[in-house]
């Protein structure tokens, strides 16, 4: 049996895909795997901020089409890039174990954390979620737009005379670049994007043979977290255009879910947390979304 795995062509996307293949090979040594690189709209447009060029799905639509057309058997994505609803005929397989969900600071030599940075320090990020949460901690920071893959963004610190950048810890860890990390941003300082650090394995809805194989990678706790966080995402109808975040913490048989929702200018930002039962994570996410949206509509600053 040969399984064709579709992915974006960035170094990080390939590392993530190879990780999935290696995990599957441990369980199914008799199966051969082949990687197929697919260019997406998000890969082709590098000089414009994500919130200006489209909605969620920017990095997945072309890959999904090849899955529907039967040209690939599995698609591997970063879960945080996935739209709320998948194309007809496609579904998620169970979710593998999540990498560290936090964001990290990668700073110029001489600086270690947010408090070290001088007044007016220039920090690069492509995310409004990160921008407005950092400005809440340090209103003096000059947050600038930065796009590109992990290596490109790190290079831009020097090339564009920035003090540093903010990236997802998961990408840095998977790319084996941990030595570049200056400090981790705690989840109560910068709430991560929903499902940050988790991988999405997408398959055809009617492909039970492939589903049986990839579901062997299921991680129970990750799946609970992702259902809660993406429940919040769906409930607020989140997109690239607005700052939005969610993080689910599992405490024994309970879950603690925090959500953030704001306007595109960062003038109205609501953060709220609720606790619920581990057996209904998606419902808790949807419930928190309703509470946050209600507070957002009545926002007085």
From Swiss-Prot:
Q: Indicate where the modification S-(dipyrrolylmethanemethyl)cysteine is found in the sequence.
A: 240
Pathway field of the UniProt record reads: Porphyrin-containing compound metabolism; protoporphyrin-IX biosynthesis; coproporphyrinogen-III from 5-aminolevulinate: step 2/4
Q: Name the chemical reaction catalysed here.
A: 4 porphobilinogen + H2O = hydroxymethylbilane + 4 NH4(+)
Q: Which UniProt keywords apply?
A: Porphyrin biosynthesis, Transferase
Could you state one GO biological process linked to this protein?
Answer: protoporphyrinogen IX biosynthetic process
- Describe its function: Tetrapolymerization of the monopyrrole PBG into the hydroxymethylbilane pre-uroporphyrinogen in several discrete steps.
The note filed under miscellaneous reads: The porphobilinogen subunits are added to the dipyrromethane group.
Full protein name:
Porphobilinogen deaminase
Name of the coding gene? hemC
